[in-house]
């Protein structure tokens, strides 16, 4: 799902799945690196498949993009990109990950956090 947070939230509730928010930007080089090099790794893909995924662009022109930047700022106190957040099916924040990492294990660990915020066991 791209640029439709409300649709992602509704789908997460319907499917009882957590939400993975990818706050990204059209001009974000580190975002493209994560998409091309981290999200394509099998272990990461396996974890991402457990989520309702939504990509929210924050650097476009217009109210829609401004609303996503405002959402990121108000809920997570940052406008840095890339920025990733995990929410439960009710939209409650569970975990965040800021920036780029080249360590698959670090990112997979973030994705495996359970609703209590602890690292889930394999």
Where do the protein language model's features map onto the residues?
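Proteins that catalyze or organize thiol-disulfide redox chemistry
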Residues: 1-52, 56-122
């Amino acid at each position: 799902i791209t640029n439709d947070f409300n649709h992602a939230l509704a789908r997460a509730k319907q499917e009882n799945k957590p939400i993975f928010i990818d706050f990204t930007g059209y001009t974000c080089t580190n975002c493209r690196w994560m998409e091309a090099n981290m999200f394509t790794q099998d272990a990461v893909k396996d974890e991402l498949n457990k989520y309702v995924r939504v990509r929210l662009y924050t650097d476009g022109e217009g109210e829609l993009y401004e609303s996503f930047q405002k959402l990121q700022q108000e809920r997570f106190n940052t406008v840095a990109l890339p920025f990733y957040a995990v929410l439960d099916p009710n939209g409650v924040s569970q975990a965040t990950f800021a920036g780029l990492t080249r360590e698959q294990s670090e990112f997979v660990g973030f994705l495996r956090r359970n609703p209590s915020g602890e690292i889930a066991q394999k």
